[in-house]
Each structure stands twice: as structure tokens, then as C-alpha cells.
Amino acid sequence: MKKNSLEIVIPIYNEGNNLIKLFKLFDTNVKTDFRVLLCYDKQDDNVFDILEVLKNFKFEVVLVKNPLNGPCSAVKEGLNFGNSDCVIVYPADDFLNSDIIDKMYKNFLEGSDIVVASRFTEGGSMKGCPILKSILVRAASSSLFLLSSIPVRDASNGFRLFSRRLLEKVEIESKIGFAYSLELLSKCNRLRYKISEIPAQWEERSEGSSRFKIFSWLPEYLKWYLYGLSTTWLKRGPDRVKIKN
């Protein structure tokens, strides 16, 4: 199997129209050698209606079956499936940030184990977000930045790069939503691996429906939020990180 410089994991649920638009942007804006892993739930996903179209792009596209349902399981399957030195988890409906993929990869080459696409650093933005969701994600991110040793201003965005070194070491315990992203960030920080961020743009999706379920996922996010704080305030060290056998 060819080893790519980078793999882009995209969890999907009937994102066919979005993928065609997104992949055109990838073709234009991404210079790094990469392949895409599309992680789907069910065989009736509309991605199967556009398989011939997907063959027209410059990069390889691989379909990865989610053994369960939901975004967390889909992403974890994609992360485990890959063989590249780093992986970016990218939203299927993000048409604003394909031009920062090369920058994220550059940060990885310079030693970062996580590169956060940050909405809240200088040059980043978040627009059209429902008010309650906006309050929660801004409060969580700003308080972790101020009260913990996590060195980035956007703790909750699921769009980020992870090194294979980190993924092969750390056990992902999260079971729902996109909490794996905050979990890996908190564990990476506890391991004292390098974390960096670059500005990213975010807008509420206009096509399809979001799978972000704020209330049902909140307890899982809170667990890893407190984990991040305990690294600083309770002096939890690398020996308290659950690693793979």
C-alpha cells in the first residue's frame, strides 16, 4: 500500500453534494500529497451515487465502513485505517479552509503532534452559530486557555491534525460525538507533546443537517474539559494517560 504524506478523514452521512464541491477545492488548493478516507455509516449513503465522479479528482479516495453509527465511531475507524504520518479530520461541509491544509501539514513537519484549526485565534472567525452553542464552545475554549496549560484558544473544534505518533500511543476512550478531539488535545498536552494552532473560519452549515447534539454530548465534553484542567491544577503527569497496549 502506498504511504501518503497525509490522510484526510471525513466522516459522512449523505454528504454527496457537499463532497463534490469540497473535492474541487482540494484539487485547487492542496499541494501536499494526500488521500481522503470517507467514513460512512450505511450502505444506502448517497456517496455511493457519486462514486464515478469521485474518480475524476487528482487524489485517491477510499471508502471506510463505520462498524457502528455516528461521527465518533466513524472518525476512530478512519484514524485506525490510515497509514500516513499524520491525519487531518475535516468536515464534509467546510468550504472555507481547504487552503490551510498545507499550513497545518507544515506545522506537523515542524514538530507539532496536534495542529488546531482555531476559530478563536487572531485571524479566525465563527459566524452563524446558534447562540447557546456559541456561548458553550467559546466559554469552554477560553477558560481552558486561561486556566490550564493547553496552549491553544480553540479546544472544541473537531477540525484538526493529529500525528501518527500520538494516535499510535493514546487510547481514544470517547464514544459519542466529536469529544475524541478534546480528549486527544487534553491527553497530548498531558504527555507534553507539541500543540500549535492556525487561524480558521467557521460558518453554520447551509446544506444538509448538522449532527452536533449539544445536550446529549455535553457530559462527555465535560469529562475531557475537567481532564484538561486537572493536568494543571492537580499536577497530573504523562503517567496518568491511558495508552494503547
Residue ranges and their predicted role:
Residues Y40-D49:
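A conserved acidic beta->alpha catalytic loop
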Residues V47, D99-I101, L184:
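Acidic donor-diphosphate engagement hotspot in glycosyltransferases and nucleotidyltransferases
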Residues N66-F81, C86, S98-F178, R205-F215, ...:
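Acceptor/aglycone-binding surface of glycosyltransferases and processive sugar-polymer synthases
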Residues M1-L6, I10-P11, N17, K24, ...:
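Hydrophobic helical membrane-anchoring modules
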Residues E15-N18, Q43, P71, N97:
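Donor nucleotide-sugar binding loop of glycosyltransferases
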